[in-house]
């Protein structure tokens, strides 16, 4: 522990917090343009074709971001909204594309966790029709 004289001569260093998503530059999300949309394979124990996109952000960063959900409508020059959040089994993928925002469509026929995939609530007419038949 330093003495008072040592603290007078040289004050304590401030702890610098390192962000896990530097390309967002202190913003919750950033807009960007897809420069390449492709699939890639995950790390060792897992096996799949994960959909990812290389995105040029408004902050001038070029990042690789994951496209969540089943199926997507993204192609080159699509405008997307990017949020933080890495994908554990894809090295170098530290961002997610927000579904249902800007050019990205929501996931079709999604019933559970719809808010995460930009899906509107299904029409309740089907449910009422089945309930009336039961009575």
Swiss-Prot record:
The modification 3-methylthioaspartic acid is found at residue 89. It comes from the Bacteria. GO terms for biological process: translation. Keywords: Methylation, Ribonucleoprotein, Ribosomal protein, RNA-binding, rRNA-binding, tRNA-binding. Residues 108-135 are annotated as: Disordered. Residues 111-122 have a biased composition (Basic residues). Belongs to the universal ribosomal protein uS12 family. Part of the 30S ribosomal subunit. Contacts proteins S8 and S17. May interact with IF1 in the 30S initiation complex. This is Small ribosomal subunit protein uS12. The lineage of its organism: Bacteria, Pseudomonadati, Campylobacterota, Epsilonproteobacteria, Campylobacterales.
């Amino acid at each position: 522990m330093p003495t008072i004289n040592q603290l007078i001569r040289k004050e304590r260093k401030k702890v610098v917090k390192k962000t896990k998503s530097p390309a967002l530059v202190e913003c919750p999300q950033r807009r960007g343009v897809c420069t390449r949309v492709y699939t890639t394979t995950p790390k060792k124990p897992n096996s799949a074709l994960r959909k990812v996109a290389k995105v040029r952000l408004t902050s001038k960063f070029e990042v690789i971001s994951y496209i969540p959900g089943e199926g997507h409508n993204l192609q080159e020059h699509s405008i997307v909204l990017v949020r933080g959040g890495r994908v554990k089994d894809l090295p170098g993928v530290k961002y997610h594309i927000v579904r249902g925002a800007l050019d990205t469509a929501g996931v079709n026929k999604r019933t559970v966790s719809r808010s995460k995939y930009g899906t509107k609530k299904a029409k309740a007419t089907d449910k009422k029709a089945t309930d009336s038949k039961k009575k």
